[in-house]
Structures are given as structure tokens and as C-alpha cells.
Amino acid sequence: MNITVYLGANEGKDPSLKTAVRELGTWIGESGSRLIYGGSKSGLMGELAESVLQAGGEVIGVEPQFFIDMEYQYDEITELIVTKDMTERKMKMIELGDVFIAFPGGTGTLEEIAEVMSKVSLKHLTAPCILYNLCLLYTSPSPRDA
């Protein structure tokens, strides 16, 4: 099974993010599944890829050429697919995925998982789609809390 994970290339402010990312990576590797991710060696992306590899799993990174030019890629992964731009990257990650998980991240992470959720909603894609709301990043305050 190919598990596409969307998450940031930054460490994040909450240490529980790194722990959760490493736990997911270990599970992916030990379960015999394959990780599909953004290809970066930095931050949470790097932590995820490293934990999958350490658990004996395969990692496919999908990264646009301009990130390769800036040397952001993780060279030790199983396979690196280079795309011309971010749009092609998103499409390739969707094409390869069987399951989609988004960790808390920035606008790019939100854009990526929103596109998958839209495709599922329109019945253009049949796949589990998980918005992992760790640290309650995606929870808006209730009107009472404002």
C-alpha cells in the first residue's frame, strides 16, 4: 500500500509533532507499506523519511526541480521523482497514493490535502483521507472562546 503523507519541511513548534511523525514512519516501514512524500531532507519531512527507512520500508519522494536545484532532496531515499513544478508534484503524489494523511503544516500542506479531499468528494478518487489534527491546529475556536 502506498501512503501519501503531507507535512512541512520545518520542525514545527510542538515536540509531539516530531514524535507522532516518527511513530507513523516506523509503522509504515514495519507494515510493508511504501511512503510517498515531498522528498525533502529537512524538518518533519526528513524525520518521516528517515524513520520509514530505519524500519525497513521504502520511500518515494516527489520533488520539483527547483527544490533539487536548492539541494533540499533526501538522497538516501528509495526513489526520487523529479517534477517540473508544484502542480505536477501534487498530481504525481495523488496518482501514487492509496491513502492520504496530512499532519499539521503550513498553507502548502493544507492546499495538498484539500485537493485530495475535493477529488474524493467529487468521486474522482476513492481513497481514505486523514486530516491528523494533532495539536488542534485545524480546530477553530468556538464563538464562546473568542
Residue positions per predicted region:
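Short internal beta-strands
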Residues: 36-39, 60-64, 129-133
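A short, small-residue-rich loop immediately preceding and capping a beta-strand
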Residues: 35-36, 97-109
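Short glycine-rich anion-binding loops that position phosphate/pyrophosphate groups of nucleotides
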Residues: 8-11, 41, 65-67, 105-108
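Acidic/glycine-enriched connector segments
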Residues: 44-103
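Glycine-rich beta-alpha loop segments
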Residues: 1-58
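Single conserved hydrophobic/aromatic residue that forms the stacking wall/gate
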Residues: 138-146
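Arginine/glycine-rich "motif VI" loop of SF2 helicases in the C-terminal RecA-like domain
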Residues: 119-127
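Glycine/threonine-rich flexible loop motifs
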Residues: 14-15, 110-113
